[in-house]
A protein has these predicted regions:
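C-terminal output helix
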Residues: 90, 108-117
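Acidic catalytic/metal-coordinating carboxylates
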Residues: 37-40, 63-66
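Receiver (REC) domain active-site loop signature in two-component systems and cognate sites
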Residues: 59
Length: 122
């Protein structure tokens, strides 16, 4: 039997974290943790060692691209999928250039989220 992939959700908006958690748990992923800011995200990544991180691009304080860089300093093989609102193409490109596997646009379409994460985990 295949084990569930372990996911860390990072978003400053509790509602967005709840939406992603709901999509993932309904599709056989295990949400091992959540973080509401960049410092918490880096600490939880190091503590939990998830298979993949969903990471909001725009957060107060440390933005998602900076968090991505810090996570990849700790683990160059880390799998990270960025979450972005429309109009953030420049930041998405920067994130991909810094090692993000893919991105998902807000508002989320559940099937697109699942497909993107499964592809990033291959």
């Amino acid at each position: 039997m295949r084990t569930k992939k372990r996911i860390l959700i990072v978003d400053d908006a509790a509602f967005m974290r709840m939406m992603i958690r709901d999509i993932l748990t309904k599709n056989n992923f295990e949400v091992v943790g959540e973080a509401a800011n960049g410092d918490e995200a880096v600490a939880k990544f190091n503590e939990l060692k998830p298979d993949l991180v969903t990471l909001d691009i725009t957060m107060p304080g440390m933005d998602g691209v900076t968090v991505l860089k810090k996570i990849r300093e700790q683990d160059p093989a880390a799998r990270v999928v960025m979450c972005s609102a429309m109009g953030q193409q420049a930041m998405v490109v920067e994130a991909i250039q810094n090692g993000a596997r893919d991105f998902i646009n807000k508002p989320f379409h559940p099937q697109k989220v699942v497909e993107t994460l499964r592809r990033a985990l291959q």
